[in-house]
Amino acid sequence: MLCGRWRRCRRPPEEPPVAAQVAAQVAAPVALPSPPTPSDGGTKRPGLRALKKMGLTEDEDVRAMLRGSRLRKIRSRTWHKERLYRLQEDGLSVWFQRRIPRAPSQHIFFVQHIEAVREGHQSEGLRRFGGAFAPARCLTIAFKGRRKNLDLAAPTAEEAQRWVRGLTKLRARLDAMSQRERLDHWIHSYLHRADSNQDSKMSFKEIKSLLRMVNVDMNDMYAYLLFKECDHSNNDRLEGAEIEEFLRRLLKRPELEEIFHQYSGEDRVLSAPELLEFLEDQGEEGATLARAQQLIQTYELNETAKQHELMTLDGFMMYLLSPEGAALDNTHTCVFQDMNQPLAHYFISSSHNTYLTDSQIGGPSSTEAYVRAFAQGCRCVELDCWEGPGGEPVIYHGHTLTSKILFRDVVQAVRDHAFTLSPYPVILSLENHCGLEQQAAMARHLCTILGDMLVTQALDSPNPEELPSPEQLKGRVLVKGKKLPAARSEDGRALSDREEEEEDDEEEEEEVEAAAQRRLAKQISPELSALAVYCHATRLRTLHPAPNAPQPCQVSSLSERKAKKLIREAGNSFVRHNARQLTRVYPLGLRMNSANYSPQEMWNSGCQLVALNFQTPGYEMDLNAGRFLVNGQCGYVLKPACLRQPDSTFDPEYPGPPRTTLSIQVLTAQQLPKLNAEKPHSIVDPLVRIEIHGVPADCARQETDYVLNNGFNPRWGQTLQFQLRAPELALVRFVVEDYDATSPNDFVGQFTLPLSSLKQGYRHIHLLSKDGASLSPATLFIQIRIQRS
């Protein structure tokens, strides 16, 4: 037996009289895709079978993309290069070619890696360098992760529109695909590539090439034996049904078959009562017979079985591969938390040095960095403001070689993109190094560009001693900045040393700052001060304010070093402070390469605005993405009750005894990506590591053994167990690596989620890349048990 069953003894439920007949009819698995044969008229273009399954072969925009277009790639005012762009027949990728005499180079980008397709001059690059091309002829392809935007100009407006519409349709179709459809599409793509002479037949050499492409290092003798067993025509070529049979054997999931047969018995189909028993053993909330019947109607592929409320092995697999069968609780993927509590009661997704796309020494600044941050659910962005020419403030990392962008352009990007993913409020964290005149210009730009989005006065509230809620501030923009004291001179200069507010105390990290700039930063424009309604940037002087003088609008900014010191020395007091008002934590200025710190320690103490360098991928950003994966990815996650109570006794350094046992049996993986596509014989040796990130006493990591030369369907069957003291704060990170005995392991994929959103039972983990992009159809298959004391 593959793994221990945690089921009760049962009596086989009565089945409908037709069950045996239906079982016999549906026992044969649903057909897998295979290259078209001459009978279906597809020999000349076998790859189009994939687009046909997407229902797009007759779409005029897609057909135009298949023919290809000569588009101009725009990088600067003088760099406009023509490229041939053509959609590949798999519908998954776009091929483009440079026009270099004698040595044309070819490149590919994948549709699933596209974040957005914009028409017109809707990117920083086209606004700056696309003036020679009419907006109607221009488009921008924005990618996920760190890849730069692709700014293009078409020969005509109609051709540009075809690419905008075509890519939009392809993205929508890919997003709507079930896991089974993704797998079918993935197979089509590799079959098309492995069929070197495009004759819709597969020689043994082509089969070996296919196996290497999909990350399988199969023994030649075994591969040839399998090949010959499927070669019923005995002509050393597989075609049609023979290829289908080979793929079915390759894709066989014995571990799923075993689980299925535990519940279906000899009938080879699940009745609705049997499926209900499986759901109950899984620990599914709301498991009823009606729910089991609904799942059959949703995921069963065979119409005969569906009519008789029966589920075949294929339908069972489709259910387990669906979002409802995933480890992440599907009900947590929409906004499900109370959004009517004060802002201080939420973790808020926050970015540091948002304007940078690379390091903070010489990297470029870009408004596109803000667009990307908002696309990742960020709700608090940083604007590092300095004196600019012509009376216009600029944003860059001061006293470095980073490039500069206009403050007003960033505000416009906020207006256009801040609420495309989430309706909840955005906080603009101003690091202000400007004089009074340009501060007034900043205030003017904020008011005129943002208009009614900008919060300029306090809302009517039944409890003025608390911050407003995310629900009350939907669609609004808050400014975090210095606030003038009540008594001041008209020019904004009457600030005593005692009353002077600290902005981000980043000035202490920047010893190179000129004295003149420091003097400018101490002056506060009345116009800009008036906009800091709910987020007054203030030096943290005490964790014990007077009980009769609550100041919920004060926001303290701390370096990671100062925050860690407070956590160690005054853990519970810091927790209570963060239950009342906002705290922002930012990386040390010494992180010149824009590296990140682990945000978990700050979340443990209730810090809301834990700012990270979004431009730098790594486990720290994986944790951030995992924390904000739930609640509709809206950028706000309600803190646990122990971090919201003003009289909380919780201390992250002393969380108490273990309260939860987490057991995860790592069973198998499927279709892991190939790390080095340029080396056909390079196959991964995968291992799985599970990490717990929480309070210090809960942090742990364990890993499986590695499996030699199999990234296609490796098997482990190993159980990893963890004891947790504060499960409500814990994140679980699943990591797959390629084992290397002589050097650090290579990253393959990961997925991170809160323990509170982890479902029990047999589940799939859908892996993500370093940049957070889907690696579909790559998955882990695991069994999860959570025991709470």
UniProtKB/Swiss-Prot annotation:
Active site residues of this protein: H352, H397
CDD domains assigned to the protein according to its UniProt record, in alphabetical order: C2_PLC_like, EFh_PI-PLCdelta3, PH_PLC_delta, PI-PLCc_delta3
Start and end residues of each stretch annotated as Substrate binding: 73-101
Residues that coordinate or bind Ca(2+) 3: N353, E382, D384, E431
SMART domains noted in UniProt: C2, PH, PLCXc, PLCYc
Subcellular location as annotated: Membrane; Cytoplasm; Cleavage furrow
Region (Disordered): 461-519
PH domain: residues covered: 63-172
Protein's name according to its UniProt entry: 1-phosphatidylinositol 4,5-bisphosphate phosphodiesterase delta-3
Gene from which the chain derives: PLCD3
